[in-house]
Amino acid sequence: MGVDLQVTVNLDHPELLDAPVLETGVLSAEGRALPTPPRPRIVGVGTAVTRTSYSQQEVLDAFGITDRKVRSIFLNSAIERRNLTLPPMDSDSVRVSESQGDLLDKHKKLAIEMGAEALHACLKRCGAELSDLRHLCCVTSTGFLTPGLSALLIRELGIDRHCSRSDIVGMGCNAGLNALNVVAGWSAAHPGELAVVLCAEACSAAYTMDSTMRTAVVNSLFGDGAAAVALLAGPGGATPATSEGPTVLKFASCIIPEAVDAMRYDWDRTQGRFSFFLDPQIPYVVGAHAETVVDRLLSGTGLRRSDIGHWLVHSGGKKVIDAVVVNLGLTRHDVRHTIGVLRDQGNVSSGSFLFSYERLLEEGITRPGEYGVLMTMGPGSTIETALVQW
């Protein structure tokens, strides 16, 4: 009876002799080297937002909100502007009330429009065409669609009918990394074939209006946005555009069952529609567990938190970001992209971390061998992480 022996080598950057080693090869019982499954690389990213942008003051004015406490929540959110699709005004210049059916229609329309734009931008960045796409995974939590968004986009854009697809629905703000994990596995099993994760969140289609502080917090936070990220494992026609992306090395998750009700998007019988609930303790719950999941992510890699050059964290809100910074010992500079996305877009849910990733790429400062951590958090309560290397 033979035993497989694992040998560790750095295949991506063999020139970095002092770099921690993360790639694993396997020897068979006969001592022959078995091929190592190719690791997926991020080869493109693209984002999109809806056409209209509002300051927090403009949103307050649009709905005639005068309550001092509610106004304070909006104006002290560290958010300057958000892209939103507000309801039309009636003959008296008052915003009309939207039914749940209206909101579902809005979600479908905006998700397709933003999703298509983000997908095109992503493919353009990596020098690919729609005809190159072999797997499309769509993520959304701001509406429910059957058939899923992937099927609707395939029809809308004329994508090959043989393109495989998947939809991740209802997982919330963490779902972009859940999807990246799944699609990274697909990419490794299909070397040379292009896959895309597309997050499309029409947060303007997931709101309610009342006088509670709970609703005020939610309505002050979210914005419309879509983000797409392309993955490719092994050979596949790499170009200068695709070489800027990192290799995906590892994922780690942490769900906090005792806080399962702390973040919810469920049916509000009083309002007759779906609505968000965000517990005020969320920042502290996330902060208290951030260190645990990051340490698990780095376990066995030889890396310490101080070795991570780039942190791309979900723009979950001012207090959530502060809690992550404090508990991981980061600086405001470390999360500058996250802070900037929150300031300019608000919380765009599952695709927020990809907006931050796009900003990092635009800086042009990443260097071969550097490591990055991607982090999202959402209902469950859940923290998702990924380790990448340029």
From Swiss-Prot:
Instruction: Give the annotated active site.
Output: 173
Assigned EC number: 2.3.1.246
Q: Which UniProt keywords apply?
A: Antibiotic biosynthesis, Transferase
Q: Which InterPro entries match?
A: Chalcone/stilbene_synt_C (IPR012328), Chalcone/stilbene_synt_N (IPR001099), DPA-CoA_Synthase (IPR053446), Polyketide_synthase_type-III (IPR011141), Thiolase-like (IPR016039)
- Catalytic reaction(s) noted: 4 malonyl-CoA + 4 H(+) = (3,5-dihydroxyphenyl)acetyl-CoA + 4 CO2 + 3 CoA + H2O
Q: Name the GO terms of the biological process aspect.
A: polyketide biosynthetic process; vancomycin biosynthetic process
Q: Which domain of life is it from?
A: Bacteria
Q: Which family does it belong to?
A: Belongs to the thiolase-like superfamily. Chalcone/stilbene synthases family.
* Name this polypeptide is given: 3,5-dihydroxyphenylacetyl-CoA synthase
Listed GO molecular functions?
Answer: acyltransferase activity, transferring groups other than amino-acyl groups
Q: In which pathway does it act?
A: Antibiotic biosynthesis; vancomycin biosynthesis
- What does it do? Involved in the biosynthesis of the nonproteinogenic amino acid monomer (S)-3,5-dihydroxyphenylglycine (Dpg) responsible of the production of vancomycin and teicoplanin antibiotics. Catalyzes the Claisen condensation of four molecules of malonyl-CoA to yield 3,5-dihydroxyphenylacetyl-CoA (DPA-CoA) and three free coenzyme A (CoA). DpgA requires the presence of the dehydratases DpgB and DpgD to facilitate the aromatization of the DPA-S-DgpA or DPA-S-CoA intermediate.
